[in-house]
Each structure stands twice: as structure tokens, then as C-alpha cells.
Amino acid sequence: MDDSGKTIKGSVDVKGREGSIEVSELMHSIEQPTETLTGKITAKCLHSSFSFMKEIDSSSPWLYKALSTGQTLKSAVFKFYRINNNGQEEEYFRTSLENIKVTEVNSLMMDVKKHQWARHNHVEFIDFSYKKITWHYLDGNVIYSDSWNERNG
């Protein structure tokens, strides 16, 4: 969602997820700075960029706009799906980001003339920085958030 409250739409046409953006890869890490010998915590957790890969789609120009203008996006929700014991797809985990800056966009087009890349679509790697992140494991409603401007005990 952009800073005016408008949803940035992707090209997914799967029933129930129409207009969302399909993410094919995701990487994010958090590091707790500690003293090497004692393990004593020396600073607040360091959050890396929230990085993901997606196909170039209708959301791409909006993400480029946010990057090039310094626009703050209000929120983004990443939903994780799996196949349950009944063979049905279900959402089981969710990561929500708030007050997001698009910090990098890298486009990639593999050499589609080479056989191994012939069926690969054009993709882009997006990096987000954020002020708040919330992790939500749906089974049991387990939720935790971390924010740059709040202390969590």
C-alpha cells in the first residue's frame, strides 16, 4: 500500500489472491550484536533489507516510482502458503512491514536463447527497508513485532 492508501497491484490471477504480487524468492536476516567472548548483547538487533524476487509485472512501475522519489509505502504483507495434510493449500505464516522505503531494484533477464533459461520470465530483485516488522504464525495466533522506535523489553 502506498502513502496515499492505494494498493499496489500485481498480476496474480489465482482465485482469492487476484491482484497480489507473487514472490518467488525471499531473503531477510536479523543479527543480534554481541560481545564475542561473553555473548553479552551490545546493541539493538540489526535488520537487513527485506529482499525478494518477483516477475516484472504491473507493480513494477509503482515500485520504481517509490524508489526514485523516496516515497514511503505504508505497508506490505507477505503471505506464506503450504500444502496441508488434506492436500489443500493454506496460508500458515505472514510477515507484515510498515513504513517502507524501496532501497534497490535490480532487473534481470537471463539469456533466453540458452536452453536452460528459455522458460524463465524477466524478474526483478527488490529491497525494502522498514520501520516495523510483524511475524504472525497463524496456527495458534503467535505474533511478534520489532520496531526501530520502540523497545521490546
Would you name each region that the model predicts?
Residues 1-153:
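Glycine-rich, low-complexity intrinsically disordered segments
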